[in-house]
């Protein structure tokens, strides 16, 4: 787990020109705090303690403005920059080396059972205010433009921009 924390810190240092030091990221960056808390919540969920997992998730959302469901799968070196207003749903899968900016929703479109949230492949950038809804896939290294809306049954191929 600590290796992933180090990777996350390095990711923020590399992608945020305003980041001055690792201690600044650990203490002051809501995106880092939300990712750290998500990993704890997911551990509790995986060990059959869903109430504790949801408690951690909701407490973190209240503190950071970033709501990540404990069931969401988040890859390595994911950066959440200016994290206010981010929602990541239960069956969302986020790959490695993904950048997520403020106001992004990775959400469902209803009360369907099973896979109902997006899959974000490696290397994707999701711009500010983008809404990616339903069980769709955003392909490797794609860029979802700020304010874009991508809905169910759409497949944005690798290296495309919405």
Regions found by a protein language model. Give the residues of each.
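Residue-level marker of positions within ordered structural domains that often coincide
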Residues: 45, 103, 161
